[in-house]
Amino acid sequence: MFNTMRKFCLLGMLALLLALLLAADPPLSAISYASSSKPSTGQNKIIVVSISQEELYAYDNGQLFISTPVATGRPDLPTPTGIYHIFNKYSPYTFISPWPVGSPYYYATVTANYAMEWAQGGYFLHDAPWRGYFGKGANNWHKDPLMGEDPGTHGCINTPTAVMAQIYHWATIGTTLQINA
């Protein structure tokens, strides 16, 4: 009986440890590739975004290429998590609000220098020259030096322009984008 209880406790502890490991963001040196779907190009490149840390890490053949703080979706318009692939690239790209004037989500027309689309519905990884703050807390109400009070993006992933130029020229159509909570 004692051995049975001991085995049961050990299995429970192992299950808890596995659940905790699966829920955590990957360490900077680890890359988790999608096993079910390989892109046709960009196979050795992956962009990993941590929403909780508001950070982006781009890897080339397992080596860190570039990292940067980002701004992601506000609580009521969150950035979706999951595995995606870049399927369109634009330079420049003009964003026009799909929401009418007067909507709490309306925004004035803006142009990004570099934009890469990764999900239907207008989800892009792009620079945001109008934004002055990137990093932890950028996806909740905060004081932005260029925008004033800001709640985060409308679901896109924003980066500083200089960094986005490098990512844009490095990434190819098909590059994997992994977005973690």
Q: Which residue stretches match the model-derived regions?
A:
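Exported/periplasmic cell-wall-interacting domains
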Residues: 40-42, 77, 81, 93-181
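Cell wall/extracellular polymer interaction/catalysis modules
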Residues: 26-97, 105, 111-115, 120
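N-terminal secretory signal peptides that target proteins for export/translocation
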Residues: 1-5
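Small/flexible residues
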Residues: 8-9, 23, 87
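Sec-dependent N-terminal signal peptides
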Residues: 6-18
